Design a protein with these regions (language model features):
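Membrane-interface extramembranous regions
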Residues: 2-139
Length: 139
């Protein structure tokens, strides 16, 4: 049961939950990916194309978010950094630049990865700013 001293902000909760999700996705991706960079459209985790470098990036994002979730200021900072980075990756993916496919196995504008990066980046920025005003009891 949470006490007043263990209350988390929504930004901390977001960072913790999405950090764990990104860690799990990063680990799971190693079971389906066959190449370090590039890759086949058949190397998918559910509907998301992955490769080993992509999985390492997911592990890093997860670790940064979890580390940031420890404090309110850390969560705001990590949510901002991850949000800006993911929106940038989404933009590059939507532009269909070849290096995104060659390096991270992120395909053109119809790729589920681009939409996921856009949504996650927007949520992270929301929780780095306006969405971090109230506190929630720790679970």
């Amino acid at each position: 049961m949470a006490t007043a001293g263990t209350a988390r902000t929504p930004g901390q909760t977001f960072a913790l939950v999405f950090g764990v999700i990104y860690l799990l996705v990063g680990v799971a991706g190693f079971f389906v990916a066959t190449e370090f960079t590039g890759g086949s459209v058949d190397d998918k985790l559910i509907v998301f194309p992955v490769n080993h470098l992509h999985n390492i990036v997911h592990l890093a994002i997860g670790g940064l978010l979890i580390a940031g979730a420890r404090t309110t200021a850390g969560a705001k900072q990590m949510n901002m950094i991850v949000g800006v980075a993911l929106l940038g990756v989404a933009l590059l993916g939507f532009l269909g630049l070849d290096f995104m496919q060659d390096l991270l196995n992120i395909h053109g504008s119809g790729s589920a990865d681009n939409w996921l990066h856009l949504a996650t980046g927007a949520l992270a920025l929301y929780f780095a700013t306006a969405g971090d005003k109230a506190t929630t009891a720790g679970v």
